[in-house]
UniProtKB/Swiss-Prot annotation:
It comes from Aspergillus niger (strain ATCC MYA-4892 / CBS 513.88 / FGSC A1513). The active site is at E377 (proton donor). Pathway: Protein modification; protein glycosylation. This is Probable mannosyl-oligosaccharide alpha-1,2-mannosidase 1B. The lineage of its organism: Eukaryota, Fungi, Dikarya, Ascomycota, Pezizomycotina. Residues 1-21 form the signal peptide. One of its GO terms (molecular function) is calcium ion binding. Ca(2+) binds at T503. GO terms for cellular component: cytoplasmic vesicle lumen; endoplasmic reticulum; membrane.
Amino acid sequence: MHLSSLSLSLTALAIVSPSAAYPHLGSSQPVLHTNSDTTQSRADAIKAAFSHAWDGYLQYAFPHDELHPVSNGYGDSRNGWGASAVDALSTAVIMRNATIVNQILDHVAKIDYSKTNTTVSLFETTIRYLGGMLSGYDLLKGPVSDLVQDSSKIDVLLTQSKNLGDVLKFAFDTPSGVPYNNLNITSGGNDGAKTNGLAVTGTLALEWTRLSDLTGDTTYADLSQKAESYLLNPQPKSAEPFPGLVGSNINISNGQFTDAQVSWNGGDDSYYEYLIKMYVYDPKRFGLYKDRWVAAAQSTMQHLASHPSTRPDLTFLASYNNGTLGLSSQHLTCFDGGSFLLGGTVLNRTDFINFGLDLVSGCHDTYNSTLTGIGPESFSWDTSDIPSSQQSLYEKAGFYITSGAYILRPEVIESFYYAWRATGQETYREWIWSAFSAVNDYCRTDSGFSGLTDVNAANGGSRYDNQESFLFAEVMKYSYMAFAEDAAWQVQPGSGNQFVFNTEAHPVRVSST
């Protein structure tokens, strides 16, 4: 779907020119707006869903990491520090829910990040805890400074961010500076892994650089950027089969890639996401990151774009390994449209915007083609392996399901949000509302929201008894922001961004502001 060929229903919609807000799109593309009462009612409904999930978590699971929303039990999969609370903070701030915000701030002040009985993931802890606290700090010290009256409670967020960084930084103490991911913070040990993944290594720089910029201690930025340097200049050269597209695993001892398997799927995904986001964060310091993203984006369009045989109008991203394309993808991968749209708007590149919209449309198809209206965990368009039971689905939808699970992932709604912000086209908000409504209809329990075992079965199959913390951080936030008023943290056209979202949807203030 390209900007020049969007076809939208105009029923009950007003049409205005987007040229003022989105000058790079030109005046030929109308911005369509729903009735303001409808927009407000949808924003209120999403806030109510957030509060429903929070109330259940608070009653049955707090201060543990996550609620088990079927049994009303709890889990501690993220170190036992209250992941859902910290992950919910920035969304609660944006929704201006002072009661929840203060509950979370009180909790953060009590966390001892030096103590846990579980293995700690550097990656997950960075994006959820460190990102959540830094975002809360930036929002409450900035555009939402009137929400919390006691400034000392806000200051604790930065203090605790530094405490967490100090606990985690031994992960980078390796011969190369490429960190271990799985840590024993009590002993200062690790799992002895020989390699680390592309996304795990390449999704640290934003949070750790922000921590340095706020504290004035360059240690954190230096550590994360040293690790990133091996990804920006990949060795051996064979690890970069196409310009900007690199392998999936890095040797911890010497920083060299151990393969040349390329994808935007889970395990690789957020490395590419952060390249352009670091440029948004500070274009002066991170011009090389932008150059690498542009190279990767152009190579992706040329070498990885794939069209199902029964639906050549759709675009998915294949993977690549030693001359062979893998024709399968994941819900996780559907962040890709948003990445192209962010890069396209920031760099004024219509080709990236158009390709991003193609990817968004393809991911929408995975939602629009199931019985629940929710997309599957993974899918394929490889005609050599279509199950007979899904032949009709492939004929109609251009894909078949390889895992029908849904664990409250946000990536499709996330890319719908970027499409809405990049184009102003009302269609994308309608897609957000449809996706949110499906989650609300099929995943809601008496105490929260559960995962589903099969999005293409009646009632979503059976339920997973787990509510991931990213429901609060991402699904609720991206859904809400599409119907909320414009604000400093919303994605803006061109170079107008005051905030940039980490991969857990926590907005951090860009360096120049």
